Amino acid sequence: MAGAASRRSTLTLYSLCNCCHCHRVRLVLLEKGLDPEFIWVNPASPPPDLLEASPGGHLPTLVDRDVVLYNDRVIIEYLDERYPHPPMLATDPAGRARQRLALARIEQDLYAQLPRLSRSVREERELAREALRSQLVAGAAVFAARPYFLGTDYSLIDATLAPLLWRLAHYGIELPPEAAPVLEYAARMFARPAFRQSLSAVEQEMRDDGPAARPPSSETVR
């Protein structure tokens, strides 16, 4: 795709500053050790180069030289194939399929609740909180089984779960004692340098333990 955005020589991500979908892409970029340019977008006034690259103004949008992608799931799988070290999906087909199924379940069962948490109707927000709370409690044993979710190595699943878990307190979701493995897992994910660097200024303020850290990448506000 021609145009100013696709002619960029750097890896560029157009991102919202408070979006879980955008956050997981930022996290994958940094876990890969890449040096992207983050362009923080005001959705009420998207920059012309974003609209040129992605006429719908989709966020997140990734520009990697002449490749322009949107849809966070598509982007993170592209990044794992385009920049294979460290690998963030299993090397065997069966392992990759299991991880993709897990990603689909997380998106369907957990990420799908996020829009409801911002609704104006209190009952709707509480239903979403309870849905997230109950599903995380039900999966506590899986979080306890291995150092990372479903494996011994950091994967796209971990990069998908961590941004969601970071937002629990912000949305008023408290987990009960039986979900301690979830909180222990979350603490390990939050301690990773790439996670600390992936946080926007807005996301840092979502929790009391938000760091005053900045990504090792250039940032532009549009």
Can you describe what each PLM-predicted range is?
Residues M1-L136, A140, P216:
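GST-like domain detector, emphasizing the conserved glutathione-binding G-site
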Residues A102, I106-S198:
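GST-like fold's C-terminal all-alpha helical module
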Residues P43-A44, V182, E203:
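Conserved beta-strand edge residues that scaffold enzyme active sites
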Residues L62, L165, E178, S217-S218:
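Intrinsically disordered, low-complexity segments enriched in proline/serine/threonine
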Residues R65, A162, A201:
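Conserved residues at the C-terminal ends of beta-strands
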Residues I39, D72, E178, L199-S200:
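Residue-level detector of family-conserved "landmark" positions at structurally sensitive sites
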